[in-house]
């Protein structure tokens, strides 16, 4: 049974995720080259600790990874069917997923103590961020209560068929968020066949991307839409003032 959808034009109670009046804007950083997963996690955890201590601004870090799989806290080894790429065990919630070129990963480091300390509502806010981003390309993304992430209906594939276009996995440490979202812009979708994505084996539920849906969307297009939608839900952003050596030598502030 498919749950009632929530799409971009419906309203969620997300007002609590906007920052306090005296908060600094969220810094926005983009890495051009693929970032190795262990390096990204180490940098993310370092920045999150600085945010919790009040020594750094909140940060959204956009990047791509080289091809790899990650297993969250609910991951099952049986969901790795054909290990083609390295597998990394990680502290985020969720199960097994794929990351690689053509997929936009956004690591979101927000201080929820100063926003809204509610993990379920935070995940819903991330889903709504993705849904609003997809809406910029006239793609109707939907959320499901029993399937975290964002889905698109695929009647062309059969009745009740849906494909996942974006995944979510989060962790909180001292109420600062780690990890975040991954939107499929133009990844190699065949790489998902080596796993049971997010533990969902029902053949009605697959994986798609913006390009797979027939849209000529570039990563730069996706980044612009992500930033605009983020601002509506989480508040103002500002280009990172300089490359942060704790993040990545290949990172840049948006032009």
Curated annotation (Swiss-Prot):
It is found in: Cytoplasm. GO terms for cellular component: cytoplasm. One of its GO terms (biological process) is protein modification process. Residues 54-238 form the BPL/LPL catalytic domain. InterPro entries: aa-tRNA-synth_II/BPL/LPL, BPL_LPL_catalytic, Octanoyltransferase, Octanoyltransferase_CS. The record marks 164 as: Lowers pKa of active site Cys. Pathway: Protein modification; protein lipoylation via endogenous pathway; protein N(6)-(lipoyl)lysine from octanoyl-[acyl-carrier-protein]: step 1/2. It catalyses: octanoyl-[ACP] + L-lysyl-[protein] = N(6)-octanoyl-L-lysyl-[protein] + holo-[ACP] + H(+). The active site is at 198 (acyl-thioester intermediate). The keyword Transferase applies. It is an enzyme of class 2 (transferase). PROSITE patterns: BPL_LPL_CATALYTIC (PS51733), LIPB (PS01313). Substrate binds at residues 92-99, 167-169, 180-182. One of its GO terms (molecular function) is lipoyl(octanoyl) transferase activity. Its EC number is 2.3.1.181. Keywords: Acyltransferase, Cytoplasm, Transferase. Catalyzes the transfer of endogenously produced octanoic acid from octanoyl-acyl-carrier-protein onto the lipoyl domains of lipoate-dependent enzymes. Lipoyl-ACP can also act as a substrate although octanoyl-ACP is likely to be the physiological substrate. Belongs to the LipB family. NCBIfam families: lipB, PRK14341.1, PRK14345.1. In the reaction, the free carboxyl group of octanoic acid is attached via an amide linkage to the epsilon-amino group of a specific lysine residue of lipoyl domains of lipoate-dependent enzymes. This is Octanoyltransferase.
């Amino acid at each position: 049974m498919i749950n009632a959808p929530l799409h971009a034009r419906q309203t969620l109670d997300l007002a609590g995720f906007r920052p306090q009046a005296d908060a600094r804007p969220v810094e926005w950083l983009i890495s051009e080259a693929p970032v190795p997963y262990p390096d990204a996690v180490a940098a993310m955890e370092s920045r999150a600790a600085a945010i919790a201590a009040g020594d750094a601004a909140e940060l959204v870090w956009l990047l791509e990874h080289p091809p790899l799989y990650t297993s969250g806290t609910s991951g099952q080894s049986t969901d790795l069917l054909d290990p083609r790429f390295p597998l990394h065990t990680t502290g985020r919630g969720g199960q097994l997923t794929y990351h690689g070129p053509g997929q936009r990963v956004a690591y979101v480091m927000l201080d929820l103590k100063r926003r809204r300390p509610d993990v379920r509502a935070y995940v819903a806010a991330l889903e709504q961020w993705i849904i609003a981003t997809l809406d910029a390309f006239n793609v109707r993304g939907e959320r499901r209560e029993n399937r975290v992430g964002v889905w698109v209906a695929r009647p062309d594939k059969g009745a009740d068929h849906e494909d996942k276009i974006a995944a979510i996995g989060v962790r909180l440490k001292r109420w600062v968020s780690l990890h975040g979202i991954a939107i499929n812009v133009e990844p190699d979708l065949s790489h998902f066949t080596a796993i049971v994505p997010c533990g969902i084996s029902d053949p009605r539920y697959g994986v798609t991307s913006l390009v797979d849906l027939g849209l000529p969307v570039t990563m730069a297009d996706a980044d612009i839409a992500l930033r605009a939608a983020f601002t509506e839900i989480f508040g103002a952003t500002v280009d990172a003032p300089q490359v942060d050596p704790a993040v990545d030598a290949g990172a840049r502030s948006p032009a």
